[in-house]
């Protein structure tokens, strides 16, 4: 299957443990991503593989289910609720310790095909997901800085 992919990388002045603590609070993404109006767990499990959250962004409701849970290293989840022609996307966060904190990579994959309509839809969806990734990485960096100040005070 062809996949449309996008990734971005940022550095955060916080340990992988501290960054993971933010990502691992899976249902609470609305607390640090301003474009998300609401998020909540829709499974009993709020962490680990299988944990599922509902995310409300404007008029769109997404359901995100954890598929990879490697503490302080990698978190991946599927995203359902986009237009049917787009299908199910996958977002992966990767954390790598660095001399100045943590290097964070967020990548998104969306199914594509040789069909021009599906390829166009995947490209447009990936553009929106790229914008969302910028909001999420900015929010993650700000949340890590806020929590770091709380710890040092």
For the regions a language model picked out, list residue spans one by one:
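A structural signal for well-ordered alpha-helical scaffolds and beta->alpha junctions
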Residues: 16, 59, 88, 126-129, ...
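Hydrophobic ligand-binding cavity/cleft-lining segments
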Residues: 1-43, 153
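Short Pro/Gly-enriched beta-strand edge/turn motifs at strand-loop
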Residues: 35-36, 45-49, 73-79
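Alpha-helix N-cap/helix-start motif
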Residues: 32, 86-88, 115-118
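Short aromatic-glycine motifs in intrinsically disordered, low-complexity regions
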Residues: 51-55
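Hydrophobic-ligand binding "helix-grip"
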Residues: 56-105, 109-112
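A conserved amphipathic terminal alpha-helix motif
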Residues: 109-153
